[in-house]
């Protein structure tokens, strides 16, 4: 019993000793810029290309929640990648239509344009795998980007990512 009391006393003493006051640490925030090239914090935000294929578009309530959270985050940049078969290319017919499924990406890019958020825009993959090295894909992709920036006025797009990963 005495041995247990001694062990408990030592443990109590050890725990109490951890509560002693520590040296005060002073933190100084300097106005000096240490990395002028730093864009800031950002996020991946894709325009829910597949939402209609899943059975429903993103609701207004979900958009409001998303925007509220992004307003809290205050991102300086967004990486926005599209999946062209759900966006501007209809795989079933083989046709290009830059106005196809434009609502969600317009909403995303409008949010970024209004808040001065830089967008790194790109495509995950070609419309169909056979187009991987086809000039037709490049032409459609560039035309769609031109449509977003010049025709619709989404000046937030500053960078273009032609492919998600090297050699897919």
Q: Where is each model-derived feature located?
A:
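Positively charged n-region of N-terminal signal peptides that target proteins for export
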Residues: 1-5
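Bacterial N-terminal signal peptides
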Residues: 7-17
């Amino acid at each position: 019993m005495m041995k247990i009391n001694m062990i408990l006393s030592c443990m109590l003493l050890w725990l109490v000793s951890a509560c002693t006051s520590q040296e005060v640490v002073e933190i100084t925030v300097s106005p000096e810029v240490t990395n002028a090239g730093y864009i800031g914090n950002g996020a991946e935000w894709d325009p829910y290309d597949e939402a209609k294929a899943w059975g429903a578009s993103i609701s207004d309530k979900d958009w409001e929640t998303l925007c509220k959270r992004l307003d809290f985050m205050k991102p300086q940049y967004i990486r926005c990648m599209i999946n062209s078969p759900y966006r501007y290319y209809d795989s079933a017919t083989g046709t290009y239509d830059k106005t196809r499924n434009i609502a969600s990406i317009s909403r995303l890019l409008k949010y970024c344009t209004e808040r001065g958020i830089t967008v790194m825009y790109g495509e995950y993959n070609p419309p169909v795998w056979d187009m991987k090295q086809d000039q037709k894909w490049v032409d459609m992709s560039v035309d769609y980007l031109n449509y977003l920036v010049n025709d619709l006025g989404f000046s937030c797009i500053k960078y273009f990512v032609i492919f998600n990963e090297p050699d897919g």
